Regions:
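Helix-to-loop junctions at the C-terminal end of transmembrane segments
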Residues: 51-63, 257-271
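Cytoplasmic helix-loop-helix junction between adjacent transmembrane helices
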Residues: 94-133
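Helix-loop-helix hairpin linking two adjacent transmembrane segments in secondary transporters
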Residues: 128-179
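Helix-breaking motifs and short loop linkers at transmembrane-helix boundaries and internal kinks
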Residues: 31, 63, 84-90, 101, ...
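Conserved MFS/SLC helix-loop-helix module at the cytosolic interface between two early adjacent transmembrane helices
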Residues: 50-89
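Cytoplasmic membrane-interface "Motif A"-like loop-to-helix N-cap segments
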Residues: 61-71, 266-281
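Juxtamembrane intracellular "pre-TM" segments in multi-pass secondary transporters
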Residues: 178-210, 409-424
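Extracytoplasmic gate region of multi-pass secondary transporters
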Residues: 19-20, 204-258, 350-355
Length: 428
């Protein structure tokens, strides 16, 4: 069951990423500037983020199979519309469909994981889902780009639509929501639905999950979905093949890091925020060095940037683990939906801001951005890193205060490490 869901998610990531690797061709096809092209993706992500809570509620009611099936069909329709589009409004409508279908997929697959892999294996399988699903990005970075250059825009995106139809058929025939004997969800009234959503939001575990997802995810997402490729090719002067290889490296790093983070979360669940802070510190540090580097950054530094960004996706999965452990089973869908809003809202706002800054600093409708424009544009990330950090710190404090009331007092990390090295009883 998990394999079918994983394939559906990988294809959703492929659909989501397909425009990013074709950003330059999109500007040429639609005679659009950076702001217009970024608007395609911003609206796609806005729809994705805006539907997370409604999809989460529907998921708790209808189950994963129906939601994943609906998502696959909707994304296939969006790619077909994009294949035929010749103007900006039609292209925007196409990406809105892709965003709507994408919104139905990931948290539905996470619900499959929660039912088929209960207990301590769930964090690891959640990480594997998020990371192996990024294979779709590799398919977008290599086969899709190759097909786009060898054939045409219409043929490439029509092929993407056909892939979505095949996935929908597989889900229809092979996927089940939960093992036999699992109680089916029941319909609830509007008042009970509203009360459940309020309880989900009031839970500090949901909110720390949201801010964890925000602060760890958006930089890597922005880089992989749209602005990384132009930054590497136009801003840093890399060959297109080298840039595509770096985007693939980002995914491969995540595949390696994800299982490690999953095991660490399962082993030390009360220290998950330490992993979040470590990923954030590494991301901010390497971006600062790249943006302040005089002239174009050397290739090893860009490789380091991509390696660090590769940890962002796995880091954001920790947010779902917070929501999973702090919410009851009947609220898993809505809690995951709330968490998933964080990173994608930050991503879409960052994508839009980067496009706007590039257009302001670049005359006319030219896509020939200089390095100074890219530096200014990518600096908007610091705003969202600050917002996310404050949110994580605030809600971590609330969770730890609740633990203290329950008799669980966490030692400072340095004291816990010192105690473990001294051979004393391990602290939580």
């Amino acid at each position: 069951m998990w394999g079918v869901g994983l394939l559906a998610y990988a294809v959703a990531v492929f659909h989501r990423s397909s425009l990013g690797v074709a950003a330059v061709e999109a500007q040429e096809r639609f005679s659009a500037g950076a702001s217009a092209v970024s608007l395609f993706l911003v609206l796609q992500l806005a729809v994705y983020a805006g539907l997370q809570v409604p999809v989460g509620v529907a998921l708790d009611r209808f189950g994963s199979r129906r939601m994943i099936l609906a998502g696959a069909v909707t994304m296939a329709a969006g790619q077909l519309v994009l294949a035929l589009a010749t103007d900006v409004p039609t292209a925007i409508a196409a990406r809105v469909l892709v965003g709507a279908g994408d919104a139905m997929t990931f948290i539905s697959v996470l619900r499959v994981v929660s039912f088929w892999f209960p207990g301590p294996t769930a964090p690891l399988v959640t990480q594997l889902t998020g990371i192996l699903g990024q294979i779709g990005s590799i398919v977008a970075a290599y086969p899709l780009v190759t097909l786009l250059h060898a054939t045409s825009w219409a043929a490439t995106f029509a092929g993407a639509a056909a892939t979505g139809v095949l996935v929908a058929l597989l889900v229809l025939l092979a996927l089940r929501d939960a093992p036999e004997g699992t109680p089916r969800p029941t319909a609830v009234g509007l008042a009970e639905l509203r009360r459940g959503l309020v309880d989900t939001w009031r839970e500090p575990g949901t909110r720390i999950g949201l801010y964890t997802h925000l602060v760890t995810q958006f930089s890597g997402t922005v880089f992989a979905l749209l602005w990384g490729y132009p930054f590497l090719v136009i801003g840093q002067g890399l060959a297109p093949g080298t840039a595509a290889a770096l985007l693939s490296l980002l995914v491969l790093v995540g595949m390696g890091v994800g299982p490690v983070l999953g095991r660490l979360c399962a082993r030390w669940p009360l220290r998950r925020s330490v992993l979040v802070f470590g990923i954030l510190a590494a991301t901010v540090t390497v971006w600062t060095v790249v943006l302040l580097w005089p002239g174009r950054a050397p290739l090893p530094l860009l490789v380091l940037l991509v390696v660090v960004l590769g940890t962002n996706g796995p880091g954001s999965m920790i947010g779902f683990d917070f929501a999973r452990t702090e919410n009851p089973a009947e609220r898993q869908g809505s809690a995951s939906g709330v968490v998933n809003v964080g990173g994608f809202v930050a991503s879409l706002l960052t994508i839009l801001a980067i496009g706007a800054v590039l257009d302001v600093l670049t005359p006319g409708a030219s896509a020939d951005y200089d390095l100074a424009a890219f530096r200014a544009a990518f600096s908007v990330q610091y705003v969202f890193w600050a917002i996310g950090l404050v949110g994580v710190l605030r809600h971590r404090r609330q969770l730890r205060e609740r633990l203290a009331r329950d008799g669980v007092v966490l030692q400072p990390l340095h004291a816990a490490i010192r105690a473990r090295l001294a051979g004393d009883a391990p602290a939580p």
